[in-house]
Regions:
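Short, well-ordered coil/turn segments that N-cap beta-strands
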Residues: 18-22, 48-50, 125-127
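NAD(P)-dinucleotide binding in Rossmann-like oxidoreductases
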Residues: 110-114, 124-208
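A general structural signal for well-ordered alpha-helical segments in protein cores
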Residues: 8, 31-34, 86-87, 209-210, ...
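Hydrophobic residues in well-ordered beta-strands that form the structural core
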Residues: 22-24, 53, 131, 173
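Beta-strand-loop-alpha-helix segment that lines the small-molecule cofactor/substrate pocket
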Residues: 1-27, 44
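Rossmann-like dinucleotide-binding domain that binds NAD(P)(H)
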Residues: 64-157, 228
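Rossmann-like NAD(P)H-binding beta-loop-alpha module
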Residues: 32-67
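C-terminal helix-rich "cap/oligomerization" subdomain common to oxidoreductases
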Residues: 9-12, 17, 173-174, 212-256
């Protein structure tokens, strides 16, 4: 949405003044996988969500940085470039992020910016979460390498990048594997889960995004990802950066 919180607030103020419709390009908001996961959580199949584990672990080749040295400098690390999309996903699934803690390292690449981060999140509804982020990890536990939405990436259909646990069961994403207790009185680690897999479409969300954009232009609908949404994602990420720098819990301001 913008390079800074200040610029984003200026844009939001202008949108409020003019009434113009502005669509922010968070393409995962059009993912059929995410829509399916959100509907499953809302259905109560896993009960009340209590915890989430997420990861964006991948290896960016040296050529990625040589082609754009700005990626090694402030504002070019995986927190701003990659994690912001993960935050959008988690907010879509679980609601607003209330507070964050984080640790970051640039030990492997030695760039000005981080290459690896470990993050904890507290959501407004009480859900707690952890997230691992690295662009120097030889792993497939990332959205790109599990969702199969962008065919340019190698993908592994048995891998997940999100796991959401509730009081009745758990959901792994994007495989849509569900483990749950069929009876509330059976909830015990001594008892087996009922295991199932929900089917979901794996369409290209970029197509859905441009179709939606055209509908917004024609005045047929409101932007799915507003400036407010985009700015809220940026504010969470900004708090994560501050938390990593200071080592303290940072509360996230919620835009009204």
């Amino acid at each position: 949405v913008s390079q800074s919180i200040e610029e984003g607030k200026v844009l939001l103020d202008e949108v409020k003044k003019t009434g113009n419709k502005v669509l922010v390009g968070h393409h995962r908001a059009y993912s059929s996988i995410m829509e399916k996961a959100r509907n499953l959580i809302k259905s109560g199949v896993i009960g009340r969500p209590v915890a989430v584990m997420g990861s964006a672990l991948f290896y960016k080749p040296d050529s990625y940085f040589l082609e754009g040295m700005w990626r090694t400098q402030k504002g070019g690390g995986p927190i701003l470039l990659n994690l912001i999309h993960e935050i959008g996903n988690l907010r879509y699934l679980l609601g607003e992020v209330y507070a964050v803690q984080a640790m970051s390292s640039n030990t492997v690449r030695g760039h000005e910016v981080e290459d690896t981060s470990a993050i904890t999140l507290q959501f407004e509804n009480g859900v707690l979460g952890t997230f691992l982020l690295s662009d120097t990890a030889a792993s497939s536990r990332s959205w790109e390498q599990t969702s199969q939405e962008n065919k340019a990436y190698s993908s592994y259909e048995d891998e997940d990048c999100y796991h959401i646990a509730g009081t009745e069961g758990s959901l792994s994403i994007p495989t849509m594997r569900i483990k749950r207790y069929l009876k509330t009185e059976d909830r015990s680690w001594w008892k087996p889960f009922d295991c199932s897999v929900e089917t979901s479409q794996r369409d290209d969300p970029l197509v859905g995004q441009i179709d939606h954009f055209c509908r917004v232009i024609r005045g047929e609908t409101e932007p799915r990802v507003s400036v407010k949404d985009g700015l809220q994602n940026l504010m969470v990420v900004d708090c994560i950066v501050k938390a990593a720098q200071t080592g303290v819990l940072v509360q996230v301001a919620i835009i009204e």
